């Protein structure tokens, strides 16, 4: 089965914004593309409430990756779009925040990262996480 496009969410950053040099634009938000498998029709969060398609990321956690997201933003997305025991996919895993939060919220997870340096950081972050059994 394939994934179906669901929506795009705007994640606004309150600090650490970047200038896109080629266009001379200060970028204050990041698009989060949401895809789903096996769900169609009306968009609802897994809690049954209406989904909010923009929210503020008050803290950008750059400890694990230079473009890292705070755990609270990742937790909001995971809990909005998945239930416990469902699968979460992060195709650009970076420092592994999504994988750690997915495990801590009882989700299965797959992370993809091509940079070997960050693959090792992900492994270390997963080992430090309090509720993670790895591999």
Q: For the regions a protein language model found, what residue spans apply to each?
A:
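Core catalytic lobe of class I
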Residues: 1-112, 117-119
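Class I S-adenosyl-L-methionine-dependent methyltransferase module
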Residues: 127-135
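Conserved SAM-binding loop
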Residues: 122
């Amino acid at each position: 089965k394939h994934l179906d496009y669901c929506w795009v969410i705007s994640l606004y950053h309150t600090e650490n914004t970047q200038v896109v040099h080629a266009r001379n634009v200060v970028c204050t938000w990041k698009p989060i593309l949401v895809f789903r498998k096996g769900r169609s029709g009306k968009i609802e969060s897994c809690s049954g409430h209406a989904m909010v398609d923009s929210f503020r990321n008050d803290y950008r956690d750059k400890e694990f990756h230079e473009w890292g997201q705070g755990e609270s933003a990742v937790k909001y997305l995971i809990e909005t779009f998945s239930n416990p025991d469902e699968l979460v996919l992060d195709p650009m895993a970076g420092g592994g925040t999504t994988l750690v939060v997915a495990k801590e919220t009882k989700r299965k997870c797959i992370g993809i990262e091509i940079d070997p340096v960050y693959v090792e950081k992900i492994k270390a972050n997963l080992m430090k996480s309090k509720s993670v059994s790895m591999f």
